[in-house]
A protein has these predicted regions:
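N-terminal phosphate-binding loop and adjacent alpha-helix
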Residues: 1-36
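Active-site nucleophile and cofactor-binding loops and adjacent substrate-binding regions
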Residues: 10, 40-47, 66-69, 92-101, ...
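Glycine/Thr-rich phosphate-binding loops that ligate phosphate moieties of nucleotide
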Residues: 13, 41-82, 115, 137, ...
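A polyampholytic, Gly/Pro-enriched intrinsically disordered region
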Residues: 13, 82-98, 199-202, 227-230, ...
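Conserved phosphate-binding loops in N-terminal lobes of ATP-dependent enzymes
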Residues: 26, 31-34, 39-41, 121-131
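Short helix-loop-beta connector
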Residues: 35-40, 118, 202, 224-226, ...
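Gly/Ser/Thr-rich active-site cleft segment
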Residues: 45, 89-212, 281, 286, ...
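ATP-dependent carbohydrate kinase catalytic cores
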Residues: 155-265, 276, 292-296, 303, ...
C-alpha cells in the first residue's frame, strides 16, 4: 500500500503465505511426477536486502514491512549525513546513509511505532522472517546471514561480520533488537509440524539461514572473482561490480554507491540502483497500456520499440515514480519532449533507456575508480528482453551477456542447500558446471556516442534546468 507520498508498506505475511502456497504446489507436482517429497534435503531461501519488519516474541509482525522503495526517512538521512562521520565508510564501506537503508527504517519504527516499542523484540528481513516461521522459531531466535547483514547499510562492521556497538549507539538502536548473524548455509532448525501439514512436506527438513537476493544472483551469474559487472534487472534495477574489499574512491560521499558483503567468504561488491527500474516497466505495461497480468505484452512493446531509433527521438522518461533521491530528491516521474508523432513504442523505448542513463552514471564512477567494465552479465527477469540488453550494451559501451538461467538466485540456493547437507564440497565448481551462456550483445560505437551526448544533456536537464520545476511540482501535490 501507499499510505502517503513516498511511503511503501507491505504485509510481510504475504511473503510467507505465497511461499507456503508454492511449497504445497511443488509437493503435489512432485507426487504427480512420481517423485517423493521426502527426498528434499534442505530448504534455502533468499530475499530483499534493504527492507525490514519488526516482530514480537512469537515472531509475528508488529509493524508494516518497509523496503527500498520507501523514502519516508529522507529528512532523517539528511540529519545523519550532516554528521559527516568517517566511521560509516570505514566500517561499512558506505560513507553516507540512504533512505532505503534498514538502519534508517529501524530508527523510524523506534520513533513512530508504539506497537514496536511496546511489543517488538527484533527487526528482520523478509527471507529470514519466512524461514524462521517455516521452522517455528520464536522472535528472539531471529537471524540474518552475513551478506544480508550488509543490507542494513549502517550499524555493522562489514569485514568482521558483526554488529558495530559504536555505530548502533550513534544511531540510537539497541543491539538487543538486532538478529544474530549466521553463515548462509548454517542450519537454523527444521520444518515445523504446522507448516508440514499445510505443505505436505515431511516435518524436520533442515532449514538454512538463507542469503540476500542480489548476492545469490551474482553467484548464479558466474561472478566468482573481483572486477566483474552484473546488471540485476529486477524490480529494483541494480548495477553491481565485485571487488576484493572496500575501495576508498568508491566509498566516498557523493558516489551514490552501496557496498555489501557477498554470500561466500571474502567476497564483496558495490552497487548502484534505479529504485523503480523494473517497477517502472511494469507500471507502464499495467497502468499506461492497461495490460495488467499480461506478461507477454512486454514482448509486444519491445517488438514495436525495435523500430524506434536509439535515443527515442529525444523523448525522455524520468523513472522517479516513488520519488527522487540524492541531488534529485524532489524529482518525480514524467515523460518529456513528446509530440503527436510519438506512440506507446516510443514511450516504451524511452522507459528502457531511462534505466540505462542512470546505469551510465554508475559505470562512469566505476571506471573512474579503476574498475574495468568491458563485459557485463545481466540476470533476472529483465535479461530476457534482448532489445533492452542491446540498448544497455550501446549505452555502457560494453559486451552484455546473459545466461540460460536468468533467475540465477534460485539455482544458487539449490547449490547451497546441497553444500549445507554435504552433497557437494565446492560451491563455485558446482555453479560453474551448470551456468550456460544464452546470448550476448556488442556495442555500436556510433550509437554509444549518440547516447553519451544525450546522457550529458539529460544530466544537465535534471540537475539544473528542472530543479525549480520539481520543487514546484512537490508543492502542487500538496494542494487539496
Amino acid at each position: 500500500s501507499y499510505p502517503r507520498p513516498g511511503w511503501v508498506e507491505m504485509n510481510v505475511d504475504t511473503y510467507l503465505e505465497n511461499c507456503i502456497t508454492a511449497m504445497a504446489e511443488v509437493t503435489s507436482e512432485l507426487r504427480r511426477s512420481g517423485r517423493d517429497p521426502k527426498d528434499i534435503a534442505a530448504i534455502m531461501g533468499d530475499g530483499i536486502i534493504c527492507g525490514i519488519v519488526g516482530i514480537d516474541e512469537n515472531a509475528r509482525p508488529v509493524t508494516p514491512y518497509i523496503n527500498y522503495l520507501d523514502s519516508r526517512t529522507t529528512p532523517d538521512v539528511e540529519r545523519i549525513n550532516a554528521m559527516k562521520l568517517p566511521l560509516w565508510g570505514r566500517e561499512t564501506g558506505n560513507a553516507e546513509a540512504s533512505p532505503m537503508f534498514p538502519a534508517m527504517f529501524a530508527r523510524w519504527f523506534l520513533e513512530n511505532s508504539s506497537e514496536f516499542r511496546e511489543r517488538g523484540v527484533k527487526f528482520v528481513h523478509n527471507a529470514p522472517y519466512v524461514l524462521m516461521r517455516l521452522a517455528g522459531l520464536s522472535g528472539r531466535d531471529a537471524f540474518i546471514d552475513w551478506g544480508a547483514m550488509s543490507g542494513w547499510g549502517l550499524g555493522y562492521d562489514v569485514m568482521k561480520k558483526r554488529w558495530s556497538p559504536e555505530q548502533l549507539e550513534i544511531l540510537g538502536i539497541d543491539e538487543k533488537y538486532m538478529p544474530r548473524i549466521l553463515k548462509p548455509w548454517d542450519r537454523v532448525g527444521g520444518l515445523c509440524e504446522a507448516i508440514s501439514v499445510r505443505t505436505g512436506l515431511p516435518a524436520g527438513i533442515p532449514i538454512l539461514a538463507g542469503a540476500g537476493d542480489t548476492m545469490q544472483s551474482m553467484l548464479g551469474s558466474g561472478v566468482f572473482e573481483a572486477n566483474q559487472g552484473v546488471d540485476v534487472a529486477g524490480t529494483c534495477s541494480m548495477f553491481c561490480v565485485s571487488t576484493k574489499g572496500i575501495i576508498p574512491e568508491l566509498s566516498r560521499p557523493g558516489t551514490g554507491l552501496i557496498f555489501n558483503s557477498g554470500t561466500l567468504p571474502d567476497t564483496y561488491f558495490y552497487w548502484g540502483f534505479v529504485r523503480t527500474g523494473g517497477l517502472a516497466l511494469r507500471w507502464f505495461k499495467d497502468h499506461v497500456c492497461r495490460h495488467e497480468g499480461d506478461g507477454a505484452y512486454y514482448q509486444t512493446l519491445s517488438a514495436g520499440a525495435r523500430n524506434v531509433p536509439a535515443g527515442s527521438g529525444g523523448v525522455l522518461f524520468l523513472p522517479y515514480l516513488t520519488g527522487g533521491y540524492g541531488e534529485e530528491k524532489e524529482a518525480s516521474g514524467c515523460f518529456l519532449n513528446m509530440t503527436m508523432d510519438d506512440d506507446r513504442f516510443v514511450m516504451w523505448r524511452a522507459v528502457l533507456e531511462a534505466i540505462g542513463y542512470d546505469y551510465m552514471e554508475l559505470a562512469d564512477g566505476y571506471r573512474a575508480a579503476g574498475v574495468p567494465l568491458t563485459r557485463i552479465t545481466v540476470t533476472e527477469g529483465g535479461s530476457r528482453d534482448m532489445l533492452w540488453n542491446q540498448i544497455k550494451s550501446h549505452m555502457l559501451e560494453a559486451e552484455v551477456v546473459r545466461y540460460r538461467n536468468a533467475g540465477g538466485a534460485v539455482l544458487t540456493n539449490c547449490v547451497f542447500g546441497a553444500y549445507a547437507t554435504g552433497a557437494l564440497a565446492d560451491v563455485k565448481a558446482a555453479l560453474a558446471g551448470v551456468i550456460e551462456e544464452n546470448g550476448s550483445c556488442s556495442p555500436d560505437p556510433e550509437l554509444s556516442r549518440r547516447y553519451r551526448d544525450l546522457f550529458e544533456n539529460r544530466k544537465a536537464l535534471v540537475r539544473e534546468d528542472m530543479r525549480k520545476a520539481f520543487s514546484r511540482l512537490v508543492r502542487m501535490r500538496a494542494i487539496r
